[in-house]
Structures are given as structure tokens and as C-alpha cells.
Amino acid sequence: MALVPYTSPLDIVFYPVCAFLFCVIGFAFFATFIVSEMTTAKAQKNIFRELTLALIASMSLGLGLFFVLLAGGIYV
């Protein structure tokens, strides 16, 4: 039984595009999180909104970093 080489489900050409998109989305949610933290009064803060913004920003920036590494030739 011959081994079949692994091929990525996403073409290598799209790594920089995905890196850019995920980083932009992550920074947008991060900026929204920071602005909401600075402008909302302490009594009006909503923990679920804050956690949602932080989670989306964190996951998007993590995926963006992953694709930046892949685009740079560092295969993790």
C-alpha cells in the first residue's frame, strides 16, 4: 500500500489572503472591545458582550497568526 502525500485543503496562494483577512477581523473586534471598555460606564457593562468580543478577537488573531506563519514558510 503506497503512501499518498498530504495536500493542504487550502491552496498555498490563499495563505496571505487568509492571514490578512483574519488579522483585519481580529483587530476590528479587538478595537471594538477596547472602545467599549473605555466608553461604557461600570454599571452598564455586559460581561457576555465583553467575552464575546474578546473571544472572537482572540480566535481571529490566532488564525491570522497561523496563516502568517504558513505564508512565511513556517509550517506548524
UniProtKB/Swiss-Prot annotation:
It comes from the Eukaryota. It is found in: Membrane. The keyword Transmembrane helix applies. InterPro entries: TMEM258/Ost5. The chain crosses the membrane at residues 14-34, 54-74. Keywords: Membrane, Transmembrane, Transmembrane helix. Signal peptide: none annotated. One of its GO terms (cellular component) is oligosaccharyltransferase complex. Coiled coil: none annotated. One of its GO terms (molecular function) is oligosaccharyltransferase complex binding. GO terms for biological process: response to endoplasmic reticulum stress. It is a multi-pass membrane protein. Its main location: membrane. Belongs to the OST5 family. Subunit of the oligosaccharyl transferase (OST) complex that catalyzes the initial transfer of a defined glycan (Glc(3)Man(9)GlcNAc(2) in eukaryotes) from the lipid carrier dolichol-pyrophosphate to an asparagine residue within an Asn-X-Ser/Thr consensus motif in nascent polypeptide chains, the first step in protein N-glycosylation. N-glycosylation occurs cotranslationally and the complex associates with the Sec61 complex at the channel-forming translocon complex that mediates protein translocation across the endoplasmic reticulum (ER). All subunits are required for a maximal enzyme activity. Component of the oligosaccharyltransferase (OST) complex. This is Dolichyl-diphosphooligosaccharide--protein glycosyltransferase subunit OST5. It comes from Dictyostelium discoideum (Social amoeba). The lineage of its organism: Eukaryota, Amoebozoa, Evosea, Eumycetozoa, Dictyostelia.
